[in-house]
Amino acid sequence: MKILLIGYGAMNQRVARLAEEKGHEIVGVIEPTPRATTPYQQYQHIADVKDADVAIDFSNPNLLFPLLDEEFHLPLVVATTGEKEKLLNKLDELSQNMPVFFSANMSYGVHALTKILAAAVPLLDDFDIELTEAHHNKKVDAPSGTLEKLYDVIVSLKENVTPVYDRHELNEKRQPQDIGIHSIRGGTIVGEHEVLFAGTDETIQITHRAQSKDIFANGAIQAAERLVNKPNGFYTFDNL
């Protein structure tokens, strides 16, 4: 499989290493500005790369959105987070002409977490729910795209839900419809996501901890391996 990388930060550097270990080839990199330290051919536009089988994106909205407005037809794996609604609308449009895969978290374990959460929410309908995510001190966006995904699962199953990001100015007791959302940034934490169900005299916690960023890179590669054989359409872990 010949892979074009969109962005060449820490994540796509891992994708390159792991993909080559699997026998795949990196045919180029798209970066906002050329860098002498990038060990692959650099491009400005997706359409300039003629021999790629798939593109894998671990970048940011500033780089990705202008590229998505260009004319190209290439299977696309997208892991960028930020401006989610705008991104999903654009990817849905592109999926009419190419296979597109998107996940806010490329770990299959996190996908499993969403399924566990979907089963737990109806069973624990009268429990309070608090969501917490923790990441390294270099992560810019908060809350994480993954936590937003977990929140979306809850919203799809409960009525009149209210996200609460900060309680220090509320000066009132917790309301039944509140969903607490908390972000922690520090050190080199790869990624942790926890769902707390708090009931009367008991609590239940569901936690996913990433031990290495390799799980995200491998997840993107595995998605790409499947996507190249798919017809045009919008894919997630649910239908890939």
UniProtKB/Swiss-Prot annotation:
PROSITE patterns: DAPB (PS01298). Belongs to the DapB family. GO terms for biological process: diaminopimelate biosynthetic process; lysine biosynthetic process via diaminopimelate. It catalyses: (S)-2,3,4,5-tetrahydrodipicolinate + NAD(+) + H2O = (2S,4S)-4-hydroxy-2,3,4,5-tetrahydrodipicolinate + NADH + H(+); (S)-2,3,4,5-tetrahydrodipicolinate + NADP(+) + H2O = (2S,4S)-4-hydroxy-2,3,4,5-tetrahydrodipicolinate + NADPH + H(+). Pathway: Amino-acid biosynthesis; L-lysine biosynthesis via DAP pathway; (S)-tetrahydrodipicolinate from L-aspartate: step 4/4. It is an enzyme of class 1 (oxidoreductase). GO terms for cellular component: cytosol. Its EC number is 1.17.1.8. GO terms for molecular function: 4-hydroxy-tetrahydrodipicolinate reductase; NAD binding; NADP binding; oxidoreductase activity, acting on CH or CH2 groups, NAD or NADP as acceptor. HAMAP family: DapB (MF_00102). It is found in: Cytoplasm. It comes from the Bacteria. The active site is at H135, K139. Catalyzes the conversion of 4-hydroxy-tetrahydrodipicolinate (HTPA) to tetrahydrodipicolinate. (S)-2,3,4,5-tetrahydrodipicolinate binds at H136, G145, T146. This is 4-hydroxy-tetrahydrodipicolinate reductase. NAD(+) binds at A79, T80, T81, S103, A104, N105, M106. Keywords: Amino-acid biosynthesis, Cytoplasm, Diaminopimelate biosynthesis, Lysine biosynthesis, NAD, NADP, Oxidoreductase.
